[in-house]
């Protein structure tokens, strides 16, 4: 079996490592000339991604570049704030810290082995894919031709592989992907950046600033570097078809205008956003696509990572779920290979069975994650009365419940490589939070208390007028 991976993303490079472990032949085609450019992005590695990285022998390199999160601060426009120890609690439960680092650094770690092996081809932009019952052929803009048994699109939210898959399927079977065309929507934009250390912001802190129509998420990493995100609600929601033609676009000037407008807003411990902005090393503004596709494959083409699921960054699961995609697909391919032998190419029926099982696994896992990420972004921006109430009057008094909800997202349906030794690190949370739970009564109880609090506040306002 030979796999053609399109895209040197976190999903694509993780898949390369997984296939190497599974002894499956592959080549990875990346359109950029540089595998790990500095684009101002940071990445969070949660326990569910961390344990796969450990199985691949990469986690120790990641760990050298991170400052484990120990505490989380949350602030509100009225000056109220609270601190939670949930990051430390999650580490106790799962054996891995919540880790943030430069996305560039993670890509460098992931790319080192595959690049050295000669299996990564840079500057290879895919322009055409041809699918037959006997295999698949990929052509690049420079005229290179690659053949294999399976194409895996790991080329991001603007995926060329996804577009080619839709084109080929439509030509062969009509509009079988029509229901997928409107799956991605854009309701928010994000300015993300990395700043040099700021006095009064301590390594190991996460700071979330709730506001009306916007929010700020900051993580203080190793040596005090500040990884920050400014989320802004757009005037209207739009549908994104994946072609780059109909989505909103933003310039560096747009980003600067927003950051300067909010420079006076408090972050934490006397620090204002302007202090963070003044130390900014690199930044970028982008629309935030949200959505989960339900059809991931057609014949011998399959897509993974951001090309199939795009989440708001608030719960940190985007990259981790992409890592899981790579591991889950590798599990399915390796199991087939183990049963059939390394020299037998998969038939169309084989691939259909492999990929159908893979997609079923992933959709079961990712549905709740998509809902949680979408809800979190709107909660932080206090979008609507419900989110205003929940954010201000429920979360500060929820105790360990946010850690429990995060634990269910980490452990529920998480993946490891079946054909590699289990990760050495562990914790009770993997078993404790792995099964779906009954709907808790706690949120309903607190919601009732919130209603009482609002009534009291209204009465107080009336009496003091």
From Swiss-Prot:
It is found in: Membrane. GO terms for molecular function: FAD binding; monooxygenase activity. This is FAD-dependent monooxygenase pyr5. Belongs to the paxM FAD-dependent monooxygenase family. SUPFAM superfamilies: FAD/NAD(P)-binding domain. One of its GO terms (biological process) is secondary metabolite biosynthetic process. It catalyses: 4-hydroxy-3-[(2E,6E)-farnesyl]-6-(pyridin-3-yl)-2H-pyran-2-one + NADPH + O2 + H(+) = 2-oxo-3-[(8S)-epoxy-(2E,6E)-farnesyl]-6-(pyridin-3-yl)-2H-pyran-4-olate + NADP(+) + H2O. The chain crosses the membrane at residues 440-456. Its cofactor is FAD. The gene is pyr5. InterPro entries: FAD-bd, FAD/NAD-bd_sf, FAD_mOase_fung.
């Amino acid at each position: 079996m030979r796999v053609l991976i399109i895209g040197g993303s976190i999903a694509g490079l993780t898949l390369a490592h997984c296939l190497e472990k599974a002894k499956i032949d592959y080549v990875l085609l990346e359109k950029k000339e540089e595998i790990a450019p500095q684009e101002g992005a940071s990445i969070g590695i949660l326990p569910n991604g961390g344990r796969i990285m450990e199985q691949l022998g990469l986690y120790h390199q990641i760990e050298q570049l991170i400052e484990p999160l120990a505490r989380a601060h949350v602030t509100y426009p009225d000056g109220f704030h609270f601190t939670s120890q949930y990051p430390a609690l999650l580490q106790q439960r799962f054996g891995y810290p919540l880790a943030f680092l430069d996305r560039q650094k993670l890509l460098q770690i992931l790319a080192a082995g595959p690049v050295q092996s000669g299996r990564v081809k840079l500057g290879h932009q895919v322009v055409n894919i041809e699918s037959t019952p006997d295999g698949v052929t990929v052509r690049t803009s420079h005229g290179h031709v690659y053949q294999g048994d399976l194409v895996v699109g790991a080329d991001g939210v603007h995926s060329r592989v996804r577009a080619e898959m839709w084109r080929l399927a439509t030509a062969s079977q009509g509009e079988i992907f029509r229901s997928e065309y409107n799956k991605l929507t854009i309701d928010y934009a994000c300015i993300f950046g990395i700043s040099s250390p700021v006095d009064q912001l301590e390594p190991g802190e996460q700071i979330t600033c709730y506001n009306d129509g916007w929010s700020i998420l900051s993580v203080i990493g190793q040596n005090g570097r500040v990884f920050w995100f400014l989320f802004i609600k757009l005037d209207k929601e739009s549908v994104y078809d994946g072609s780059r033609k109909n989505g909103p676009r933003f310039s560096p000037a747009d980003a600067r205008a927003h950051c300067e407008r909010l420079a006076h807003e408090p972050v934490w411990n006397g620090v204002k956003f302007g202090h963070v902005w003044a130390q900014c090393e690199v930044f970028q503004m982008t629309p935030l696509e949200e959505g989960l596709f339900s059809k991931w494959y057609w014949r011998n083409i399959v897509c993974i990572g951001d090309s199939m699921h795009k989440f708001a960054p608030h719960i940190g699961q985007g990259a981790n779920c992409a890592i899981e995609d790579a591991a889950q697909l590798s599990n399915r391919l390796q199991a087939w290979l183990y049963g059939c032998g390394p020299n037998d190419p998969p038939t169309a029926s084989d691939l259909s069975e492999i990929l159908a099982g893979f997609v079923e696994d992933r959709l079961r896992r990712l549905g709740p994650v998509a809902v949680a990420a979408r809800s979190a972004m709107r909660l932080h921006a206090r979008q609507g009365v419900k989110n205003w109430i929940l954010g201000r009057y429920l979360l500060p008094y929820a105790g360990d419940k946010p850690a429990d909800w995060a634990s269910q997202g980490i452990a529920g349906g998480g993946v490891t490589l079946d054909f590699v030794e289990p990760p050495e690190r562990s914790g009770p949370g993997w078993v404790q939070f792995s099964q779906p739970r009954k709907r808790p009564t706690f949120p309903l109880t607190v919601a009732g208390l919130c209603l009482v609090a609002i009534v009291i506040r209204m009465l107080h306002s009336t009496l003091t007028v």
